[in-house]
Design a protein with these regions (language model features):
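Helix-terminus/linker motif at the lipid-water interface of multi-pass membrane proteins
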Residues: 30-49, 118-125, 181-188, 248-277, ...
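Alpha-helical transmembrane segments and their lipid-water interface positions
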Residues: 28, 32-39, 62-69, 73, ...
Length: 447
């Protein structure tokens, strides 16, 4: 069901629109968490470390996938908000075609270069074979990942956040069952974990494309439809490329940090891998909700309702802030128990590593509510330069400080780089929001 985000109370609209997205990303995270849970519990600590080590590299592919999602979603939602449905349909098909071409190129790069990247990040010898096998299978499934994410972006652009939630609920649950089947029953090891994700994402991709095609066809439009437009691809790229670069830089930064962590041994890698999975449940949730705020801003911008864009800030901070506080309490109170879920016979070093990481960063989660709400509004309004600046400042500080602090304070020094980077990034985001979107809406209101 398509939904118009340009009418109704901004708070109510955002909560109703974004909560299914929050549920969706929780189920999306089940893919990665299930992989790590099964690897750690049914195979061993080294298998958990191998999957976690590979995960940082898969984030590069996810960065491109997320950029395609955002680029298509923001442009489609803008034309949907303006009720220019024929152009909206051109944006949908152009986004899908462009994604297929990009995905093909990335598959070739991934299959040829993943092993070299594993060597570059100083993957321990005992983890190399499993890490490489996991990455190879993951790369083969990139078309499913990319097309599914673009389809999800189209759903949210049309105001429908419930359909992706239903797809993910079913496929994520199935992924857990297939993970256990392939590893416990068929004894496929780390490869079984990867093939389970490949299979379940493939089914989700095909079904979501079928439904989105029917949904787009049902939108009334006049005139002959253009299936591909270079001009439209350019509009999508203007939004997608900064998002891809932003996410890619974050991924590269995470890989650099992973290489620093790798120098401390397999037990530290395993503990960090488990804690990162938990941390990414929140980060990915907030990022996805930020893209929902972008859709809200883009639809209202297309409809010429700038004052509603400004009103979305308070509603967004309340939504994201409430989620941040819940996760802060959860990780501080039950961090050890959650980390134990990933390990069958954990070493004390692995558990202590993960727990220290969570206890260091969780108290600062609330900063992200302000940052990602501001970023979402700026991205939805096409202010990509400012959006990138906030993210890159955060990333740069995290990478530099992780390297410096690890030399002075050991592995625990690495974790301190997160809150420092978040603080600076949040400060910049708030300044940019106040001097751009907030001021523009305020000036329009007083005219």
């Amino acid at each position: 069901m398509n939904k118009d985000l340009t009418v109704g109370s901004p708070s109510k609209v955002l909560w109703q629109f974004c909560l299914p997205m929050f549920g969706s990303i929780l189920f999306q995270q089940l893919y990665n968490i299930a992989d790590s849970l099964v690897a750690g519990k049914l195979i061993g600590e080294n298998a958990l470390a191998a999957v976690g080590n590979s995960y940082e590299i898969t984030l590069i592919f996810l960065a491109f996938s997320f950029g395609c999602n955002i680029g298509g979603s923001v442009i489609v939602s803008r034309y949907f908000g303006a009720k220019d449905y024929n152009t909206m349909k051109t944006a949908v098909s152009t986004a899908l075609i462009g994604t297929v071409v990009l995905c093909g190129a990335l598959m070739a790069v991934g299959l040829l270069g993943c092993r070299s990247l594993l060597v570059l990040i100083r993957t321990p010898a005992e983890l190399m074979a499993d890490s490489a096998e996991y990455l190879d299978i993951y790369t083969l499934g990139l078309p499913f990942l990319f097309l599914y994410n673009v389809a999800t972006g189209i759903f949210t652009a049309l105001g429908d956040s419930r359909t992706p939630f239903l797809f993910l609920a079913v496929s994520s649950t199935a992924n857990i069952a297939v993970d256990v089947l392939f590893v416990a029953a068929f004894d496929m090891g780390v490869a079984g974990v990867a093939w389970a994700t490949f299979l379940c994402q493939g089914v989700s991709c095909v079904l979501s494309l079928w439904v989105v095609a029917r949904r787009v066809r049902a939108v009334p439009s006049e005139g002959e439809r253009v299936w591909f437009s270079w001009k439209m691809l350019g509009q999508i790229a203007v939004v997608a490329i900064p998002s891809i670069l932003q996410q890619s830089f974050v991924s590269v930064g995470n890989i650099i940090i992973q290489s620093v962590v790798n120098s401390f041994g397999a037990s530290v890698i395993a503990g960090f891998a488990a804690a990162t999975k938990l941390n990414n449940v929140l980060i990915s949730s907030l990022t996805t909700l930020g893209s929902g705020i972008s859709n809200y801003a883009s639809q209202n911008l297309g409809a010429g309702k700038n004052e509603r864009v400004r009103a979305g800030f308070g509603a967004g901070v309340k939504l994201l802030g409430s989620i941040c506080l819940c996760f802060t309490a959860l990780y501080l109170l039950a961090g050890r128990q959650l980390l134990m879920l990933f390990m069958n016979s954990p070493t004390g070093e692995a558990i202590n590593t993960g727990l220290t990481f969570l206890q260091t960063i969780a108290p600062f989660y609330l900063l992200l509510a302000f940052k990602l709400t501001s970023d979402g509004l700026m991205r939805g309004c096409g202010m990509m330069g400012r959006f990138m600046a906030t993210t890159l400042s955060d990333l740069f500080l995290r990478v530099v400080l992780a390297i410096l602090f690890s030399g002075w304070l050991g592995v625990n020094g690495i974790w301190l780089s997160w809150p420092v980077g978040w603080f600076v990034g949040t400060l910049l985001s708030m300044v940019f929001y106040r001097t751009s979107i907030h001021r523009q809406a305020e000036e329009k209101t007083t005219l």
